[in-house]
Amino acid sequence: MTQHRPPLEIRLCGPRGFCAGVDRAIQIVVLALKKYGAPVYVRHEIVHNRYVVEGLQARGAIFVEELDEIPAAHRNQPVVFSAHGVPKSVPADAEAKNLFYLDATCPLVSKVHKQAMRHQRLGRHVILIGHSGHPEVIGTMGQLPDGAVTLIETVEDAHTCHFDDEDNLGFVTQTTLSVDDTAGIIKELQARFPNLAAPAAESICYATTNRQDAVRAAAPGCDLFLIVGAPNSSNSKRLVEVAEKAGARMSMLVQRAEDIEWEQIGDISVVGLSAGASAPEIIVDEIIDAFKARFDVKIELAETTVETENFLVNREIRDVELTVKDMAFVNGEHRVVGISKLMQGK
């Protein structure tokens, strides 16, 4: 006799998962391995996702935290800088060591770097809204001399900070912050420093905003909201917070289906599901399959917008063909993001 499975609605958010910057960064490592052979070194996790990192390691990537960890015998092999960006000192160190490097910094993070440098060029002290210790924050602060940037993490920081010249200030933000929380910090800073200069363009990236909007729209009425992402993924953790604030009874961050605590979930009838910008779609599929094994699942697409952005890879590797098979370890065999457009503009 077939076991009865209770009904379950899964609200599958769209957009979700990989953004254009993450796609580009992973593809840079894949293409470098195809062109130059293993090993390809990567400074820091290329993106904050264990599954992605392990998949690239299996293909010949070696992850290091500092360039000094690269053996002398492999100094002729390429090193890739992560999507989060690096301080100016890192490429300078690579050049001093005669290393060939490929910079996989997200173009939107690079834009924040340029905005910060523009503030300084115009004589402003730079305020960076972000989380201390995050690689993106370290990279942005490292674009300017010591003392040229002040990090603000909370509204309380914004309320208590002081500057020598309060009329010459400019701010930028980490790209992966909560839109709502950042708005509160900016409001407090603007109230205290009326001449505070904003960046020429929004610092929080389109993908962060889009994923938060989709979760916010889907969360009301959800018994549980699952976000696929790593514990060190800033944008994924923000999605958990957004789901809770928007009305989900419970929200969880999981890296794989095996992380779901079924006993803790209890009785549920509506589940929201999304993924951080560094989480692969193949894990979303895995989690849906885990629910299908326990419930009679009906999937409702909770889509708020459609993303079409694509970023070109580095010129040095545009002559290498990227195939569906190359990216199947993160996208699955049925889904490829950006490959057809990636190679345009050679």
Curated annotation (Swiss-Prot):
Catalysed reaction, written as an equation: isopentenyl diphosphate + 2 oxidized [2Fe-2S]-[ferredoxin] + H2O = (2E)-4-hydroxy-3-methylbut-2-enyl diphosphate + 2 reduced [2Fe-2S]-[ferredoxin] + 2 H(+); dimethylallyl diphosphate + 2 oxidized [2Fe-2S]-[ferredoxin] + H2O = (2E)-4-hydroxy-3-methylbut-2-enyl diphosphate + 2 reduced [2Fe-2S]-[ferredoxin] + 2 H(+)
Family per similarity comment: Belongs to the IspH family.
Stored Pfam families: LYTB (PF02401)
Function text: Catalyzes the conversion of 1-hydroxy-2-methyl-2-(E)-butenyl 4-diphosphate (HMBPP) into a mixture of isopentenyl diphosphate (IPP) and dimethylallyl diphosphate (DMAPP). Acts in the terminal step of the DOXP/MEP pathway for isoprenoid precursor biosynthesis.
Gene designation: ispH
A Gene Ontology BP annotation from the UniProt entry: isopentenyl diphosphate biosynthetic process, methylerythritol 4-phosphate pathway
EC number: 1.17.7.4
Binding site for dimethylallyl diphosphate: 48, 84, 134, 233-235, 278
Entries under Gene3D superfamilies matching the protein: 3.40.50.11270, 4-hydroxy-3-methylbut-2-enyl diphosphate reductase, catalytic domain
Name of the protein: 4-hydroxy-3-methylbut-2-enyl diphosphate reductase
Binding site for [4Fe-4S] cluster: 19, 106, 205
Cofactors demanded by this protein: [4Fe-4S] cluster
A Gene Ontology molecular function term of the record: 4 iron, 4 sulfur cluster binding
Free-text remark on how the cofactor is bound: Binds 1 [4Fe-4S] cluster per subunit.
Residues binding (2E)-4-hydroxy-3-methylbut-2-enyl diphosphate: 48, 84, 134, 175, 233-235, 278
